[in-house]
Amino acid sequence: MKSTLIAFSCFLFPTAIVLAQPKVENLGNAINSEYNEINPVISPDGKTLYFGRVSHPQNAHGQEGSQDIWFSEWQNSQWSLAKRMTPPLNKEEYNCAYSVTPDGNTLLIMGAYDRGAYETRGFSFSKRTVNGWSAPSKLNIPGLEGMSKGEYMCGFLSNDGKTLLMAFSEKKRSTKDDLYVSFLQKNGTWTKPQSLGVEVNTDDFTETTPFLASDGATIYFSSDRPGGQGSNDIYYTKRIDKTWKRWSKPANLGPAINTDGYDAYYAIAAAGDYAYMVSKKNTLGKGDIVRIKIKSDEPSAAPIVPAPDPVALVSGKVVDTKTGKPIDARIIYENLADGTEVGTAQTDPRTGEYKIVLPKGVKYGVRAVAKDFIAEAQSIDLTNMKGGFQEVNGTNLTLVPIEINAVGVLNNLFFDTGKAALRPESNAELDRMVLTFNENPGLVMEIGGHTDNVGTDAANLKLSQERADSVREYFIGKGIEPDRVQSKGYGEAKPKATNDTEEGRQTNRRVEFKILKK
């Protein structure tokens, strides 16, 4: 039976999911207790679990129906003892985390807050700082307050931070929610929510607790539509195009996941190996959080339930090229084919570490952005990514301080072999440097071309000069004054690595910038 105990705008499910095969694992007393654990939110790297705990004596409002956000971390092959999140979070009677970004530094939480003070229903971000989590700050979503008239509301933020899924009803006091989407705009506001359409939403039944998989295209949600195993089942649908209006027919995940009870809040990490849910069966108290093995350890085996497209989890660190120290920076990743920004992330302000999730099939440029620095971008090519989920570790990003004689590499420049003409996928890197020139009107640079030692000295010197000239001409064509950009070819005279290996030769084939004035 579905419980009627409801958080202010986040579901409480004391009567939760009864999970069947295969391999259901109760997460144990480090996470579960005699109280009700609900609404699991797993970080994309699978290492942090946020969840709600109901009526616990440590909750901000004690044991009378309160709900606070708790978390546990995966350490030494086990979950750590769960801790309650401290102020400025968990100040209200009912608190809920909906999702966390891949970098682990931004939480999407229930309620619209202004400088930490609750205003109304909606959504807010809390961001990690060197001193802990920030006071929550509301997302500006035009039309949401007037559209959301039902009893419930919940949401989910995409891994790239640009898409917000929401479940709510436009009918007053209705419990039959539909799914909506809103998109982040360049000015920091969000678009008016738009319905996912009749292929997903129904008139007489509910669609709720959306979870957008790491591929950015597969949505899992809960619905009480006919044909399910119980009162509510988990369904999935896949986006067909970029309009967010065309979807595959929603399919039930079947008895491997769904039960004869109320099934909701389905969540999976980027690796796609486990699903996290809530169970009422064989629990330590009321509802417990469990995980279900949904991907076989055998690579050739079919998944137990339909899986999203594989992705890569990319991690690294942002450091100052001069000092080697970590930097608190914004991460931007873009499609090198057309220069479009795919998503953003934030480094851990304490360590400079970052994590992003990248869908396969694209060649990406990744860079860090911080005041008074110029980025050395990196490229990550997933166009021919084979197999399933991959981890790409050690993709460190460097920032060059804007100081006289500082030198950096323009990594995402592309030329055909032996040619000096810039290929179109170089534009994003070059446009970024144009922006740096415009933001620093006193900046003067030398663009230096370098080659490996294949070929004659004269040919390499000529090619390096022509490539440096091509970059200079691009900048001038974008409005940068000619006397602010010099170009010089060095040929093979200044190698950074050995020329005895292909990897070393590739490192030596480069275009650098050197700051002459600032």
Predicted regions and their residues:
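A short, solvent-exposed beta-strand micro-motif common in secreted/extracellular proteins
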Residues: 352, 362-372
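Structured interaction patches on ligand/partner-binding surfaces of diverse proteins
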Residues: 371-396
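Periplasmic OmpA-like peptidoglycan-binding domain that tethers envelope proteins to the cell wall
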Residues: 66, 223, 228-230, 440, ...
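Short, solvent-exposed beta-strand/turn patches at coil↔beta or beta↔helix junctions
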Residues: 36, 402-443, 451-459
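Short, acidic Ser/Thr/Gly-rich low-complexity loop/linker segments typical of extracellular
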Residues: 337-353
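Short, conserved micro-motifs composed of acidic
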Residues: 21-315, 392
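Short, ordered, surface-exposed loop/turn motifs in non-cytosolic proteins
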Residues: 176, 321-337
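A short, amphipathic beta-strand motif
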Residues: 312-321, 331, 352, 397
